[in-house]
């Protein structure tokens, strides 16, 4: 498994996929590859993401390698095992940035969550309709521009109107992490994707 972890942390997608295939052919279960391979690699990346060591390019390359392996393991596009919970991710209407959302999707997928991506520029109705249809446990909203803040503040109210009071609401991104959870009317404001993943691990356990 250490060879897969090494390939992932090197950001080498082709080598990562080849190693995942080799492990599968040798009898490793998909769950083991995700938990002991992808999961451990993401944990190590998390540990490096201090202010001094933060490297956005490295995260993007690792993310690309991780998602390549995930697609190899789940060719139908959705994990059939080790689902720890269903999470909806999006950038709200008016925000066309999706880097932060993509990193969060990578981290959560690596940790065994079923992640539904509503994309960028996503209307609130689409977000909550998807959350209801997919029986989501949480929604994660990424915001890079301040104009989405009024929309974020409405998510809780609209979720309650749809009978989705149980859903955890997370916010993150440059425009949102300056605010408090109370101000945004959400459960948690994440400084980083890893921070958000740690909160979900605790909240949904």
Model-assigned labels for residue ranges:
Residues 199-205:
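A charged, well-structured terminal subsegment
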Residues 82-118:
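Glycine-rich active-site/cofactor-binding loop and its immediate structural neighborhood
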Residues 104-111, 116-186, 199:
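Cofactor-cradling patches in redox/metallo enzymes
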Residues 39, 92-95, 121, 175:
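Short glycine-enriched loops at secondary-structure junctions
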Residues 79-82, 161-163:
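Solvent-exposed alpha-helices and their adjacent loops that cap or buttress functional pockets
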Residues 55, 96-97, 148:
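Alpha-helix N-cap/loop-to-helix initiation residues
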Residues 187-192:
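Short acidic-hydrophobic, aromatic-tinged amphipathic segments that line or gate anion-handling sites
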């Amino acid at each position: 498994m250490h060879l897969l972890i090494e390939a992932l942390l090197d950001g080498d997608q082709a080598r990562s996929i080849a190693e995942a295939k080799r492990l599968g052919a040798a009898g490793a279960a998909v769950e083991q590859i995700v938990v002991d391979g992808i999961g451990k690699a993401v944990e190590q990346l998390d540990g490096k993401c201090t202010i001094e060591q933060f490297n956005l390019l490295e995260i993007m390359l690792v993310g690309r390698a991780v998602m390549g392996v995930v697609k190899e393991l789940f060719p139908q596009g959705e994990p059939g095992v080790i689902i720890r919970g269903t999470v909806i991710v999006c950038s709200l209407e008016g925000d066309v940035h999706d880097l932060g959302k993509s990193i969060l999707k990578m981290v959560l997928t690596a940790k065994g969550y079923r992640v539904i991506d509503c994309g960028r520029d996503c209307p609130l109705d689409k977000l909550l309709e998807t959350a209801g249809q997919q029986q989501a446990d949480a929604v994660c909203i990424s915001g890079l521009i301040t104009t989405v803040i009024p929309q974020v503040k409405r998510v809780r109210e609209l979720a309650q109107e749809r009978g989705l009071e149980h859903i955890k609401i997370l916010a993150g991104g440059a425009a949102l992490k300056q605010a408090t959870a109370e101000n945004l009317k959400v459960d948690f404001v994440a400084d980083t994707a890893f921070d958000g993943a740690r909160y979900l691990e605790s909240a949904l356990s």
